[in-house]
Amino acid sequence: MSASRSRNKQSKLCDDERLDISRDEFNRFQEAFGKEEFRKLFFDYVDEIQDPENRKIYESEITQLEKERGVEVRFIHPKPGFVIKTALDGELKCFINIASCEEIQRPKNEVATDPSSGSRGLSWSIPMAQTTSRDDFDAKNNHCKVFDVVFHPDALHLAMRNKQFRQCLIDTALDAIEREYKVSLDRANLKFPKLDYKGIPRPTVIRKMADNPTAEEQEPHPLAHMFPTKPPAPGKQEPRVLPMKTKPSPVPEFTVPRYTIKHSHDVDLSEYTDELDAKLHVTVPRSLVVEIELPLLRSTAECQLDVTSKSIYLFSERQGAKYRLKLDLPFIVDDKAGRARFDTDMRRLSITLPVVRKSIQEQAQMHETLRHFSREDSGVELHSNSESPVEEDPDGELSDSKADISETSSPSVAPANSPFLKSSVHYQLPSKFDCNVLDNVMAFVLHVPNVQPDSIEQLREQRSLHLKFATIGSGYYPTHYAFYVELSAEHEDSSIESAEAEAWDNNVVLKLCLNSQSETPASYLAGLDATELKEYPVHGQYHVKSKGKVNAKKDNAPLDVKFERNQEGHALKVTIRPGTKEEEEDKENQDQEPESDQQQQQQVQNKKPGKKQRKKNKKERSLSESACADMILQEPLAKTNELQPRATFKLPPQRKQRSYSECNDSTGRSHRGILKRFSRYGPRPSMSDSWSSIDDSSSYSCSVDASGTSLFSQSFGGIPEEDRSDAGLSESCKKTVRFNDHIMKQVFRLDSSILGQRKKNQKRRDLKLRAQQRRLSEGDSVDYEETRGSALKQEENPSRNCNDSGLDLTGAAGAHSNNNESDAKNTMMFEMDD
């Protein structure tokens, strides 16, 4: 850029063609000037050219030759007047010679009226002539430029007597040079040296067509046929009149010098790597080089320079060299480590300032920010209110889940006067959103990921709320969303008291708190704005104050099952019929009475048992006994209200045995259920595995094996996945799987990887399992011996097996010893898993 600028400057300032000489020609000149005879002839030629008499002869011959062509030629010989010194384009020193010649017309004036003020005055017409610019040298042998402007001698005489006319003459000369050569002159720093003329006066020529050519002049030239036809000349050519400026431009007191700012870089190979922060400082230079052109200053002692971290201030009040520059730097620099140098030959001030880059801590923070921007989504939703299954860290490395999640942003409220949605921005409605009601709180979940917390704005009214926010996609391009919600007209007493919006990783949660007098809304109006509304139903309604246990029993007890055992026929009669309201009320009363007893038992169970107590609990068979006891309580209720049975099965007498959702027949073949088993010595199942434990507050289940081939299973209670419209029971085999409504969610820290956290938790679980194996190794062997002994006693005395609490009935009265041993082993494993 600087090279092209210098070439343009040389082409603009150096109009004379450079001497193009070859090496051979230069050698010939060198040999010729070495001869005395050639030097004598050369000096005689120079004296002949500079002789005034010879120049007059030369000019008369040129005039006669041009006259034969019908052109009048006048030679202008400038006579010295005064000299103006200034700067050309703020880079080069130049001189302007104000000279005079008799060949120039006299200045003329006429009376005129000023259109702006209405005052009368004189309007001057000042003829002038210009010569071509030429290169010269100043007193210090520095390169400069010289211009000649020639006026009539009367004009110079008036300038010497009238100060205003002198200034008008100077402005006319400066305007002519700027207009003709397309340059800029420094008018604020004009000097008038004690010179009459700069350089050697050189005549110039003014040509114009002759008014009355002679017959000889009109004769065609002998070689005219060889050239193209000359266009006809106009009748009378008027001289070009340059209009004067009606309003003179104000001359500034100080001149702004010409300057350039260069960015200096070093070659750093680390910028060519594939790291995220490799090209962070590509656009930040190592230093700034500021070059200021001061052609009218001889040294820096004549100016004042002040450099700060963000600006440069230069001031010079020397007469003829008044400069003032205030420059704002594009980067923050270290003003203490900078240096300045003034080139006296080029009259140029160079200032080098190192750029202040960010510290190592700031660069590390920026690198961490870029790393978080580029990280991929782990697919794990973070919720502050959900329970975390991650085990507690004894060292306190894992913080609270609420601290790991990004802080909730407080959305700004837009002013009511300005429009909420900007007309220049395109807004979208979230493609998916849900609404749930909890008492007097409406919760909206807008499924929009990567929402910027600081972009959330809301406009709340009495019965409506307008929300807008923005997201950043993978290409770092913002996408704007808007959501307008309004309460339905059915609930006129409802109003919005407060609103809260929270931005999460994958959605936005909007909570609307309604007034206490409002009813639970069944629907709402939503859209992009108030003009585009659509009615939506509320998906879920939850009431915290209601008795969930009583309602669950009312809803989940639609059937009544009756069992009758015939000792003579060795048959079991099962009757299924829908329950009545009276029976349900009796069940509710019976459940409310032992409610206090159950609370006391739960408090006792919550206490941590001792080592002996844990061994006793292993031997108890609480699972099947509790289920059977509840079914025995229902038998007298079934006898009071007998209805026509739905299905009756006659089964042979079978031995009762404890079953864990499995049915074993006499042949040794077992039907394995879909419910999972797990041991304390193996890894725990995942959260999606089902559990076969009996939920006392919701349902009861039993399994009956008929003839060793059919499996009958019925749930006393409602399971959300079942179709409750069919009250009957199919004769085909049914297996019921019940899932927990509570969803466990894993929470991970932002500053740790998922694989690393998984390995850490697995290692901690392995250590706990090893400790448990060491503590329970001796107790497990004792339990196995006791369990095997009890199984052998049951084989010897089969009559006692009839009092067993299990419900699994097999066809054979006496089973093989192999089956008993396998049952005993399964029993031992079941107790160990508890």
From Swiss-Prot:
Name its GO BP terms in alphabetical order. axonemal dynein complex assembly; cilium-dependent cell motility
Chain intervals for the UniProt region annotation (Disordered): 214-239, 374-415, 547-669, 759-834
Q: Where found, per UniProt?
A: Cytoplasm
> Would the keyword Phosphoprotein turn up in this protein's UniProt record?
yes
User: Which keywords appear in this protein's UniProt record, sorted alphabetically?
Assistant: Cytoplasm, Phosphoprotein
An example molecular function term from Gene Ontology annotations: protein phosphatase 1 binding
Q: Where is the composition biased (Acidic residues)?
A: 389-398, 582-596
**Extent of Low complexity compositional bias:** 597-607
Supply the InterPro entries for this chain: Kintoun, PIH1/Kintoun_subfamily, PIH1_N, PIH1D1/2/3_CS-like
Query: Ranges of Basic and acidic residues compositional bias?
Result: 552-571, 785-798
Q: What does this protein do?
A: Required for cytoplasmic pre-assembly of axonemal dyneins, thereby playing a central role in motility in cilia and flagella. Involved in pre-assembly of dynein arm complexes in the cytoplasm before intraflagellar transport loads them for the ciliary compartment.
- Subunit comment for this entry? Interacts with Pp1alpha-96A, Pp1-87B, Pp1-13C and flw.
Q: Provide the protein name.
A: Protein kintoun
Q: Which organism is it from?
A: Drosophila melanogaster
Q: What is the lineage of its organism?
A: Eukaryota, Metazoa, Ecdysozoa, Arthropoda, Hexapoda
State which gene encodes it.
Nop17l
